[in-house]
From Swiss-Prot:
Summary of subunit composition and partner proteins: Component of the 30S ribosomal translation pre-initiation complex which assembles on the 30S ribosome in the order IF-2 and IF-3, IF-1 and N-formylmethionyl-tRNA(fMet); mRNA recruitment can occur at any time during PIC assembly.
Function field: One of the essential components for the initiation of protein synthesis. Stabilizes the binding of IF-2 and IF-3 on the 30S subunit to which N-formylmethionyl-tRNA(fMet) subsequently binds. Helps modulate mRNA selection, yielding the 30S pre-initiation complex (PIC). Upon addition of the 50S ribosomal subunit IF-1, IF-2 and IF-3 are released leaving the mature 70S translation initiation complex.
Protein name per Swiss-Prot or TrEMBL: Translation initiation factor IF-1
Organism for this UniProt entry: Wigglesworthia glossinidia brevipalpis
InterPro entries referenced in this protein's UniProt entry, alphabetically: NA-bd_OB-fold, RNA-binding_domain_S1_IF1, S1_domain, TIF_IF1
GO molecular function: ribosome binding; rRNA binding; translation initiation factor activity
Location in or out of the cell: Cytoplasm
Amino acid sequence: MTKEENIEMQGIVLDTLPNTMFKVELENKHVVLAHISGKMRKNYIRILTGDKVTVELTPYDLSKGRIIFRSR
């Protein structure tokens, strides 16, 4: 079974929610619920409101995603 292609988009963190969840507004003005990837959590990378992030979305559910990179 091959791995499906994930969609990567840029966005801005709007709000911080419990359990390392975030509301992120994407470039196309959609708001998604995103959590931190495991490597970011392991390396204690902090994400604050207003940060520019890269979000990975699966084609199956475009309302949830994973934050994989925080821009400087």
